[in-house]
Amino acid sequence: MDDVSKCPFSGGVKGFKNKDWWPNQLDLSVLHQHSNLSDPLGEAFDYAKEFKSLDLDALVKDLHALMTDSQEWWPADFGHYGPLFIRMAWHAAGTYRIGDGRGGAGTGQQRFAPLNSWPDNANLDKARRLLWPIKQKYGQKISWADLFVLTGNVALESMGFKTFGFGGGRADTWEPEQDIYWGPEGKWLADERYSGDRELAGSLAAVQMGLIYVNPEGPNGNPDPLAAARDIRETFARMAMNDEETVALIAGGHTFGKTHGAGDASLVGAEPEGADIAQQGLGWASKYGSGKGGDAITSGLEVIWTTTPTKWSNNFFWNLFGYEWELTKSPAGAHQWKPKHGAGANTVPDAHDPSKRHAPSMLTTDLALRFDPAYEKISRRFLENPDQFADAFARAWFKLTHRDMGPKVRYLGPLVPKEDLVWQDPVPALDHPVVDDKDVATLKSKILASGLSVGQLISTAWASASTFRGSDKRGGANGARIRLAPQKDWAVNNPAELAKVLSTLEGIQKEFNASATGGKKISIADLIVLAGNAGVEAAAKKAGVDVAVPFAPGRTDASQEQTDVESFAVLEPTHDGFRNYLSGKQWLSGEELLVDKAQLLTLTAPEMTVLVGGLRVLGANANGSKHGVFTAQTETLSNDFFVNLLDMGVAWTPVDKGEHTFEGRDRKSGAVKWTATRADLIFGSHSQLRALAEVYASSDAKQKFVKDFVAAWTKVMNLDRFDLKA
């Protein structure tokens, strides 16, 4: 067939998909990403094992050699690729945001769209191609994700800077992540994400579509350093950085290298995803001069900050405060700054022509570090105390590149720092024998005889474990931070009732630990999970099913000193469809928020379905809500939720203007039988979810429902047990 566009089996066909016909259809595909079907390494591949066999010293030596091995097809600025690789590592990690924990360097996503083609990542495709011979040499012993970060570290070391350390363990994924919301804009560098007085929407952190952080020319290209400071503070805070870390990162990064804006940006070609097939995954081919070296165009800015752009120094601050600055434009027409009255002439080297010299230059965002009062105070301290600056940058760089890796137990390799850092959410090491099966049975009996209800046991365990985020591996039951600020006071946890449950469980814990032999102890973290398990078993027994919920002791209890209250505050749920909880104004529908929560819990659609159905009848709703409790026998692990949801004898109507809550009335009598939210009714409305609900509503589903619920429950309880997965 000559015309492949007419072939229904060809990749060229442009037929409408379901999402084109029904744009508001709930998308479940985010629950089924990164399956073995897309992974060429197979299910048995163990990256941690491969990494441990890596000759790390040899790899680092090869990376050092690469730094000054300039290639004709993309020459190194100042004869050193270090600054390019720092930018590569920074931009791999810098997509992280604290709001939902998504983004970051953890899976090597810079290889894929959209990140590989973001305007802010222009010409980083060249950095990755420069790395390919080394990646090829070491194969699967080092992931792209780890290699990006390690290369950034080696780049810094090769230019005289002492880094804080490096932890490996980032396993690659093999397709773009679909769960990350990058913004509402349909055009590069647009900023529809703002409302009101420059209020940034949702969990977004970057100021414009396709930028990692902020616009270096100032907000929307307005060269106002103070306005830029406001954007910087908001954006860096949403990426987990305080003012000191922000100043250190900007100044430290801009101690090296240059920006590129040699000529007319309209002469630059398409990004990698839009480039011709003959470009083989490269983009931004430029028709300006040679298109490379001294003719390179990346951001459109042409800035060299320091006199020694391939050597660590304090020169960024010397220049920032040593000159008065005036606005100018780059050869590409972008706003930047130069010293007034021709000062600083010939103090800065040219990147490619040793016969040329320049004056230093600065970005609008650099000047924010001088003219914003809080930033200026920090900057002057760093100017006067270079050792403090170096330490702050080393720590901030380590945090930047490791923030999305979760607890320290996940770090691999000999370069992991010994120091525990509070942002790593540390928990104490296990220092005692754990309970055995006989102890577990005894404890469960005491829990069930304590007067606590099944609903209280299950709600508390869920509240503890379901804080976990698969995005940045934070939260979870280990540490029992549900008993500490801020979690103990979260509205979703019903603080008054939670305090009673914890007090009872702590009494059982103290009694057991005081009487146990052989030094055995049980942590409150373990006991909370065990109590939830006991509740599930009791509820299953009431439904006529005997089941043993798996339990793996070994959790420990964190202290308040090990818990950064401000850092943990971002984990507070504003929604949890599993508990039928929704607070405040949301930017997604109830069913979309449920799927978002399920994705963060690494659940599949069947796991999400069985958990919602089970938790509803077990009485786990937040604050005793009756929405979705489609049963006359609560605290019984039955399939009643699904049976009654699919009952054609009930008709549903919304009870509020926004259609968030609904009444289910008997079709004959008109009497209200049930109430529900969108997070309930979606299991009868959405065709895929209804198909799953039908499985569990069937007359032969009794055993399967309990078995599947227990499996999904256990998965959630153990999401942060990286020690079990090692």
UniProtKB/Swiss-Prot annotation:
Heme b binds at H254. Formation of the three residue Trp-Tyr-Met cross-link is important for the catalase, but not the peroxidase activity of the enzyme. Its EC number is 1.11.1.21. NCBIfam families: cat_per_HPI (TIGR00198), PRK15061.1 (NF011635). Homodimer or homotetramer. GO terms for cellular component: cytosol. This is Catalase-peroxidase.
